[in-house]
């Protein structure tokens, strides 16, 4: 069943189904378990935090997300070249259905050679050439999403703030401002939306 149900009848970017706030490093919301969304996640920063592999009882280990102005996917691997210094890298069958605008990186391992992309991605595979027999090459391919959701919902790199947000800051403390300079106060959030719980 559903523990909490939030819904708004508003249709603008100022409309919020569920709103929570917390001061300082406190959590405005915390989920013990999986978290899913069928829409777009918007955030100021992101990371993972796990029990530290070398000291799991006493420490955490955190890494930040890698961000991009594009909806990018990153794929990488290592391939061993054949006797003529060539290799074919096979990608998943859905690769070209999901990605476009490919970018490539190649790095030789253990020795140097003028390796290059001999054939770009066609039928979900690409070719490497210019190396030595049995040489290992690390490869990386980056693609931009071209699936229907990504095409229909591009993320604007720059955008104007909404009417209620104009002249205010998401993180006023970072700019040396008081919390009153925040985008919307909790009171305003409550007044503009109807919240329901079930």
Which residues make up each language-model segment?
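Surface-exposed, glycine- and small/polar-enriched segments that build interaction surfaces at terminal
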Residues: 1-45
